[in-house]
């Protein structure tokens, strides 16, 4: 009985560890998006200071290419929308993973209690193996 519970417990621990890895990966991805959001907001603020007489360039590979100011503003705006949507998606994913992780933690606690009871019953019944 205890061996069966121990195997089940080990499987649940592995599931929990995988959830923690996924959670960590999602947090890391969200942090990268936050950094991109900050950078793009700075670019948006800088572009807002410019008028039509200013020349704007964008980097394409190793080459700087002239770009219309309106086009640059639109591109940055679209990028900000995309990044914001991705952050929301990551937040939803993080909530789901945290909920699953909490459920897994509860399952582990129950299995540990069962295992301890089985061990105690085994120790309390000499002659039985």
UniProtKB/Swiss-Prot annotation:
Which location does the Swiss-Prot or TrEMBL entry give for the cross-link Glycyl lysine isopeptide (Lys-Gly) (interchain with G-Cter in SUMO1)?
A: 66
Any one Gene Ontology cellular component term annotated for this protein? RPAP3/R2TP/prefoldin-like complex
A molecular function (GO) term: amyloid-beta binding
Q: Does the keyword Chaperone apply?
A: yes
Q: Which CDD domains match?
A: Prefoldin_6 (cd23161)
Q: Tell me the domain of life.
A: Eukaryota
UniProt keywords, alphabetically = Acetylation, Chaperone, Isopeptide bond, Ubl conjugation
Keyword Signal among UniProt keywords: no
Could you mention a single GO BP entry for this protein?
Answer: protein stabilization
List modified residues, type N-acetylalanine.
2
Question: Which of the residues bear the PTM N6-acetyllysine?
Answer: 21, 66
| Chain positions of cross-link Glycyl lysine isopeptide (Lys-Gly) (interchain with G-Cter in SUMO2) | 66
- How is the subunit organization of this protein annotated in UniProt? Heterohexamer of two PFD-alpha type and four PFD-beta type subunits. Component of the PAQosome complex which is responsible for the biogenesis of several protein complexes and which consists of R2TP complex members RUVBL1, RUVBL2, RPAP3 and PIH1D1, URI complex members PFDN2, PFDN6, PDRG1, UXT and URI1 as well as ASDURF, POLR2E and DNAAF10/WDR92.
Concerning its family, UniProt says:
Belongs to the prefoldin subunit beta family.
Q: What's this protein's function? A: Binds specifically to cytosolic chaperonin (c-CPN) and transfers target proteins to it. Binds to nascent polypeptide chain and promotes folding in an environment in which there are many competing pathways for nonnative proteins.
In terms of PANTHER family, this protein maps to: PREFOLDIN SUBUNIT 6
Entry protein name: Prefoldin subunit 6
Show the taxonomic lineage.
Eukaryota, Metazoa, Chordata, Craniata, Vertebrata
């Amino acid at each position: 009985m205890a061996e069966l519970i121990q195997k089940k417990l080990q499987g649940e621990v592995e599931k929990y560890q995988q959830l923690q890895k996924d959670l960590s990966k999602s947090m890391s991805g969200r942090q990268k998006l936050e950094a991109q959001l900050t950078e793009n907001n700075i670019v948006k603020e800088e572009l807002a200071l410019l008028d039509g007489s200013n020349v704007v360039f964008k980097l394409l590979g190793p080459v700087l290419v002239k770009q219309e100011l309106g086009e640059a503003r639109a591109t940055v705006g679209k990028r900000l929308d995309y990044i914001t949507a991705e952050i929301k998606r990551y937040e939803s994913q993080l909530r789901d993973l945290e909920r699953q992780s909490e459920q897994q933690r509860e399952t582990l606690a129950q299995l540990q209690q069962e295992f301890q009871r089985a061990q105690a019953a085994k120790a309390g019944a000499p002659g039985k193996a």
